[in-house]
Regions:
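Signature of the first transmembrane helix
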Residues: 28-88, 113-125, 147, 182, ...
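Short membrane-interface helical motifs at transmembrane helix boundaries
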Residues: 116-135, 192-208, 352-372
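Specific pore-lining/lateral-gate transmembrane helices of multi-pass inner-membrane transport
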Residues: 94-109, 300-377
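Membrane-water interface segments that mark the loop-to-transmembrane alpha-helix transition
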Residues: 34-46, 72, 77, 81-126, ...
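Interhelical loop/hinge segments that connect adjacent transmembrane helices in multipass membrane
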Residues: 19-32, 196-218, 224, 231-273, ...
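Helix-terminus/linker motif at the lipid-water interface of multi-pass membrane proteins
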Residues: 51-65, 129-130, 267-310, 328, ...
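Membrane-interface helix-loop junctions in multi-pass transport and translocation proteins
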Residues: 59-66, 164-172, 178-231, 291-294
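N-terminal membrane topogenesis motif
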Residues: 1-51, 103-104, 249-265, 336, ...
């Protein structure tokens, strides 16, 4: 039997007693840690490769050019929640009763709603971009709408893999998609861009020089993301072949009642994370940073913010294993005690990561932020 103090030195008798044996504790921690490391492998490798793109993007573009990416990806993070509207978590909750039925039902709902959302964004892409302050960039929103649709439609097959503990398939699909994204970024920005500008003197076919359109610029980051996401349909083909159209209003109503509070809570949490990037450009007083426009400030801030990837890696890996671990269980024996114990150690690990990153920023910035103009962020 283990006891944990609440941490208040003035109340020595306030303990949380965990009424299960040491072997049970160790088996829980071992299982969750093992799954976290398995999912963490793909997450850490993938995010690390994606993090290297900060090096590429800050080398290829000035802060003002990257401002549109920072802002639009902030909206994408919020739109992702709207596109899935809590159904990923609802799947973990209901699939333990009838896996195939709820997989097909939720997939049907996600496909239909993603189609409507994406059609809306396509129809109003240009007016929306004008309101955001980026006229003539409607193509960017078209690409992002497709990215959002693919993300939403593939979210449930990925959840199915996690619930069935098919870690290898999950990891393979994630890593290959990320490798394609990284490869295309390198191709567009470190080969085609300098080749078109005449910065690379090599004997290359003319069509390669014509592939890069300077008018698109940082939009190639969106295009690379779209192509990489589209590749997921191939790697998840088995899960899509298992899908059959299914609809039942009464069943969907039960799913929706469970899912919509999760959606609103997720929206609140995500807006809390993203509102700075969404509002900075509009509300930053002109001339607040001497010699820099608000768009330049947004580009600097948004790319420096990506240094937090070291923390987000651990959190995302933990989330991938924790959701099916807790929500996929049919019994709730000792669930409160298990959650308390796991949260206790999760906070400890995250604290050490935060301290480690904070103490090493002086060399991390020079390694990943290739232009000195970004360092002041």
């Amino acid at each position: 039997m283990l006891q944990f103090s609440t941490g208040n030195p003035r109340v020595l008798t306030n303990y949380v007693t965990l009424n299960f044996g040491k072997d049970t504790i160790m088996s829980i921690l071992k299982k969750l840690a093992g799954e976290t490391l398995s999912y963490g492998f793909s997450t850490i490798l993938g995010r690390s490769l994606n993090f290297l793109l900060v090096f590429v993007h800050t080398w290829a573009f000035l802060p003002a050019e990257l401002g549109v990416n920072v802002k639009l990806y902030g909206y994408v993070a919020i739109a992702n929640i709207i596109y899935t509207y809590g159904m990923e978590t609802a799947y973990f909750r209901f699939a333990k009763e009838a896996p195939e039925k709820y997989y097909q039902l939720i997939m049907t709902a996600i496909i239909v709603t993603s189609g409507f959302f994406t059609l809306f964004l396509f129809l109003f892409a240009e007016p929306i971009m004008v309101q955001l302050g980026y006229p003539g960039k409607g193509l960017f929103l078209n690409w992002l709408a497709l990215i959002l649709a693919i993300d939403a439609i593939t979210a449930i097959p990925f959840a199915k893999l996690r619930l069935e503990n098919k870690i290898k398939t999950f990891v393979k699909a994630k890593i290959v998609s990320i490798l394609i994204n990284v490869g295309l970024n390198l191709f567009f920005l470190m080969l085609l861009k300098p080749l078109q500008a005449g910065e690379i003197q090599i004997d290359a076919p003319q069509f390669l020089r014509d592939l890069y359109n300077p008018g698109i610029g940082a939009g190639y980051i969106f295009l690379a993301n779209l192509i990489a996401n589209a590749s997921l349909f191939y790697w998840l083909s088995a899960e899509f072949k298992a899908y059959r159209w299914r609809w039942d209003w009464s069943e969907f109503k039960a799913l929706w009642i469970y899912a919509y509070p999760i959606m609103f809570m997720s929206l609140a949490a995500m807006f809390n994370l993203m509102f700075d990037r969404l509002l900075l450009e509009s509300y930053l007083p002109e001339g607040f940073y001497p010699g820099k426009s608000s768009q330049v400030a947004l580009g600097i801030y948004g790319n420096c913010y990506k240094l937090s990837v070291f923390m987000s890696l651990a959190i995302q890996a933990f989330k991938y294993s924790a959701e099916p671990f807790f929500l996929g269980k049919k019994t709730t024996e000792n669930s409160k005690e298990n959650l308390a114990l796991i949260t206790h150690w999760f906070v400890i690990v995250c604290t050490f990561l935060w301290v480690g990153v904070s103490c090493n920023l002086f060399w991390i910035k020079t390694l990943f932020l290739r232009r000195a103009i970004y360092w002041e962020g």
